[in-house]
């Protein structure tokens, strides 16, 4: 009987016949999560959470531990692959109106926030020059909180500056948060299967469904294979493609890097933060760049669920995608003209998409005479 239940969950799950390749990224994200937990465990076995030994322990893993270099590269590049998949997954949700399944969407955005926190803590653990200074800049934003800011920052740091207690607690958080991600992922999948996934046409798929296995499982395997191949090729031939050159030097609190920046997958939010010449305003914009995703289900006014047949929304969606890429690029540049203006314009366009959604939905209803 238990075998039958497992089959029902993963094999006989009824899925719409017309879901496209864009629906494959959920299974790819699960694979990334499994890989990160596995490689992370083997790295944690050899890692030392001490400011004097952390950098040396990373070098030791790369040089002395059998296949340690592979574990480290897979973990670092796997994180980038994780974020590429999750950003595409969210973009698909925005384009095809998956956010109207409110509970699934809310759990997914909570999952994104937890993932971003986990990745941030992990970036600090290498104790390279950029890790230290990126952590200093980002955690220092807590001081912008009125009244409580300084106390919160001191509490997070475990002292009056980033030091040994900070590294220890960041390691503890980086170790424990993946289990929260696993729990949230389970909740996300349960909520998704409660209502069923959307499809490219946005129609009710109940009249035309097929079992998940073997039809969609085989389709998922193709992209999964390509992703794992890409991961191993990059890890073997271009292992430092996503690394910052400053991070190959041990952290030195007395020397400030010329240009402080976090990992590439946070650059869009960091670019929005930098575009506002005010600490509190920038911190709020940074938080809102993610939190604004929570309001999307409540601002949908269009009668049609996906953007497949909504040209105005399509235009705004692809503007959002190009804006996201442009902010990411601008955030890698120094804070000087013309990059300041580019960041400010693209940040405004980023928020414009979310604010214009209800107006565009209403306009498209009028254009198509849908009351």
UniProtKB/Swiss-Prot annotation:
Function noted in UniProt: Component of the ubiquinol-cytochrome c reductase complex (complex III or cytochrome b-c1 complex) that is part of the mitochondrial respiratory chain. The b-c1 complex mediates electron transfer from ubiquinol to cytochrome c. Contributes to the generation of a proton gradient across the mitochondrial membrane that is then used for ATP synthesis.
Binding sites annotated in the UniProt record for a ubiquinone: 193
Keywords, sorted A to Z: Electron transport, Heme, Iron, Membrane, Metal-binding, Mitochondrion, Mitochondrion inner membrane, Respiratory chain, Transmembrane, Transmembrane helix, Transport, Ubiquinone
Coiled coil: none
InterPro entries associated with the record: Cyt_b/b6_C, Cyt_b/b6_C_sf, Cyt_b/b6_N, Cytb/b6-like_sf, Cytochrome_b, Cytochrome_b_C_euk/bac, Cytochrome_b_N_euk/bac, Di-haem_cyt_TM
Assembly, per entry: The cytochrome bc1 complex contains 3 respiratory subunits (MT-CYB, CYC1 and UQCRFS1), 2 core proteins (UQCRC1 and UQCRC2) and probably 6 low-molecular weight proteins.
Membrane topology classification: Multi-pass membrane protein
Cofactor: heme b
Main location per the UniProt record: mitochondrion
Subcellular location per the Swiss-Prot or TrEMBL entry: Mitochondrion inner membrane
More details: Heme 1 (or BL or b562) is low-potential and absorbs at about 562 nm, and heme 2 (or BH or b566) is high-potential and absorbs at about 566 nm.
Protein name per the record: Cytochrome b
GO molecular function: metal ion binding; ubiquinol-cytochrome-c reductase activity
Pfam families assigned to the protein according to its UniProt record, in alphabetical order: Cytochrom_B_C, Cytochrome_B
Source taxon at top rank: Eukaryota
Species: Aspidites melanocephalus
Chain positions recorded as heme b b566 binding sites: 89, 188
Protein family membership: Belongs to the cytochrome b family.
Organism ancestry: Eukaryota, Metazoa, Chordata, Craniata, Vertebrata
Heme listed as a keyword: yes
CDD domains: cytochrome_b_C, Cytochrome_b_N
GO cellular component terms, semicolon-separated: mitochondrial inner membrane; respiratory chain complex III
Positions of transmembrane segments: 25-45, 69-90, 105-125, 170-190, 218-238, 280-300, 312-332, 339-358
A biological-process GO annotation: mitochondrial electron transport, ubiquinol to cytochrome c
Chain residues that bind heme b b562: 75, 174
Annotated cofactor note: Binds 2 heme b groups non-covalently.
Gene3D superfamilies: Cytochrome Bc1 Complex, Chain C
